[in-house]
Design a protein with these regions (language model features):
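A short, conserved, highly charged catalytic patch centered on acidic carboxylates
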Residues: 2-4, 16-21, 26-149, 161-197
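An amphipathic alpha-helical core segment
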Residues: 151-159
Length: 197
């Protein structure tokens, strides 16, 4: 089964025996992104209809924001866009984004996956989380360390939701963040990358 075949959290839970709970677990100080990033984002928001298509959300909001957060941690992590992640026939596919520990062998080798990001197609967060949880399970199994948290993000570019898988329990962060709360959102992204490994 491809990751995208999982349509909601409960389907993925039942398939793999994962418990579920909701909790506020992300506490991060707001951080303002660099001025150059803010200028580009403000230009895009003012002059382009960035939320009309998946491609525009990807290229003008999601990728730039993830890349900006990643820049502060590039010595520790590798940042992948549509890198295949295959554990088994039931857990395989291509995550939209993946952040993993950096390999001593270079940027072409995938090491320990720590963060997976799923774009909520057509703003469907229910399906996005079903897919994301399957990707988190695959990442956890590839890591061969169930006690190491693996973080998931589902976003449509405007709303960003967070979760984590530890052992056989998935925890959904109760607070969502939007572009209008950019310092809070950016602070949470940095906090996840700071604590991921």
């Amino acid at each position: 089964m491809a990751f995208s075949d999982y349509k909601n959290i409960s389907q993925t839970q039942r398939e793999f025996g994962i418990a579920y709970r909701e909790e506020r677990f992300l506490f991060a100080a707001p951080v303002l992104p660099p001025q150059s990033f803010l200028a580009d984002l403000e230009f895009n928001l003012a002059n382009m209809d960035i939320f009309t298509s998946k491609a525009s959300r990807t290229e003008l909001v999601i990728s730039p924001l993830l890349r900006e957060a990643y820049k502060r941690f590039y010595e520790r992590y590798a940042f992948w866009i549509q890198k295949p992640l295959n554990y088994s026939e039931k857990l395989s596919g291509i995550p939209d984004y993946l952040i993993a520990t950096k390999s001593a062998l270079g940027k072409t080798v995938l090491e320990t996956p720590l963060v997976v990001v799923v774009e909520a197609k057509k703003n469907d967060f229910e399906q996005g989380w079903g897919q994301c949880l399957a990707e988190l399970i695959a990442a956890q199994k590839l890591n061969d360390n169930p006690s190491l948290p693996v973080f998931g993000i589902v976003t449509d570019g405007e709303l960003w939701k967070f979760g984590k898988l530890i052992g056989a329990e998935f925890v959904l962060e109760t607070t969502g963040y939007t572009l209008t709360d950019l310092p809070e959102l950016f602070g949470v992204l940095l906090h996840i990358l700071e604590t991921a490994d």
